[in-house]
Amino acid sequence: MKQFLAAAQEIDPSYHLISGYRSVAYQTELYNSYVQQEMADDPTLTESQAEKKVQTYSQPPGASEHQTGLAIDMSTVDSLDEADPATVAKVKKIAPKYGFVLRFPDGKTSSTGVGYEDWHFRYVGKESAEYMTEHNLTLEEYLVLLKEKTK
């Protein structure tokens, strides 16, 4: 991860780690704060509706990849989803060399269930990352392919 971040900083020195491993307690706190913010922004939302909306950009405790230690959020800015698209494209291109993939790519929400996140990278190993990138596969699509090959 340190090598990947260093390589990203060679592309843009302002690239920095925003989040890595998260405990269940921290993910609970973060998730609940997002739900409360959605309800404050739209008082007509029920808690269930707010949770459904939140789950398009943050996972509930126990479901977040950050709890595995395999996911990182990194960007050039502190406000997520505001990085320069050209810079993100360059970082996405080098990610497989370090075993990472952009976890929730643009146009793949139907596969991942999560909207585009230009900051969220997942470690899958170099070989898998290179294959997934070459074939434009999400982790979900890649896992289906692996299961089919083992049949």
Over which residues does each language-model region extend?
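Cell-envelope/glycan interface and biosynthesis
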Residues: 1-150
